[in-house]
Amino acid sequence: MTTQKLPGTEAARHGTGDADLTIMIAAHDAFRRDLTRLARTAASANLADPAKRQSVAAGWDLFKRQLHMHHTAEDEIIWPTLRPRLAHSQAALSVLDAMEEEHEHIDPLLAAVDAAFAEHDATLGGDSPGEDRLADVIDVLTSTLTGHLAHEERDGLPLIGAALTAAEWRSVGFKMGRTNGLSSGGEMFAWILDGADREDAAASLGKLPPPMRLLYRAVWKPRFDRTPRW
């Protein structure tokens, strides 16, 4: 997984204050990575093969689960934490409103991909409208979600560093960890680092305390790798 240098995101990637946004950006890059895998799968994979179809379903289900967890953390923990600190700035509050609104637009697109997969499965062996439909809705999801991620990195994430100290941001991270639970957090880290190069993996793992790095290597990654995806 190679970190993408999107236009206008350097402030977010390196932080406008003391808040370390490494894991947030790594998660965004993992979503982009899986969108590429999803599009490639729809274009070329033999979904009539049961084993391949199962691995695609596993990858897609994990993507949806991670996106739901990520957006829920933002909508229920991160943005509400920022709002009182940014109450003096209508521009900043408008950005947070836009982030939440964009999340609402993405959810129906996930359902549309689910429906297109079902249609594709139902038309296997016949004509190709199911295949065409699947490619079309994946294109829409990819365009919408990557646009949202770029918008958030450009305008949303810098608000974290502007509003919170490093200690306050760590406290937000602990709250998200308690909400998600250790097992879900372990799956998240294994998912983020799936296919990561040595430098990116070291940057993300370096944010974990040593016992959790040991858990990643001994438990989370081996468990993650047992399931074929994509």
Describe each region flagged by the PLM.
Residues 1-230:
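Small-residue-biased structural context
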